[in-house]
Amino acid sequence: MKLYLASKSKFKSQILDKVYINHECIDVNVKEESTKTNAHEYVMELAKLKARHGATMVSDGLILGLDTVVLMNGKIIEKPKTLEEAKENLRKASNNKVSVLTGISLINLDTEEAFTDFQETKVIMNEITEENINYYIEKEKDALYVSGFVIETVASCFIQSIEGSYYNILGLPVEKFYQLLRKMNLDLKDID
């Protein structure tokens, strides 16, 4: 069975590659807006929207839709549109607790089964000096993604501790993906 990742995100695709899950990326290009104010419902609604849109682009297989946001002081921190917004997100995160929420939606086009859930990871941040914020923005070419935090590079130095899924912070909680796959009575070996 073919797996389609409803995203052109190189980060998400690399995660699937790292855990040896064959897949094909499809560009769903949906407007990331939700009517939900609850962050958990928000990410699940957008993940479902992406998966459903992806389902209109192929005729069979599995469609995986994902949406990740950072929640800080009870507010959703969206992907920054400018480098200044990315800097501001880092300033707010300094010496703070943040939650990374990912909505995950899996559709089996062969059986018409669909499951949607979310994963939450709590992150405690170290102090981030203005000099280090500028250094990070200068070095990190992908700073305009995932609320400005690219944990695999310099931003990893800013993290004091993580409670929950590391892969969730990267945008694809493989543990939750596996759980949804098992709900469909499928195994990793079923994906080709």
What function would you assign to each model-found segment?
Residues 1-15, 120-192:
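GST superfamily/GST-like fold recognition
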Residues 1-62, 75-76, 131, 182-192:
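N-terminal polybasic phosphate/anion-binding patch
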Residues 16, 47, 67, 86, ...:
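Residue-level signal for inorganic ion chemistry
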Residues 20-25, 30, 105-112, 143-156:
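Mobile beta-alpha loop/short-helix "lid" or hinge segments that flank ligand
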Residues 42, 68-98, 125:
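Active-site-adjacent loop/tail segments of enzyme domains
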Residues 64-69, 152:
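ATP-grasp fold ATP-binding core
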Residues 71, 107, 159-161:
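Short beta-strand-to-turn element immediately C-terminal to the catalytic PLP-Schiff-base lysine
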Residues 90-139:
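Conserved core of the sugar-phosphate nucleotidyltransferase
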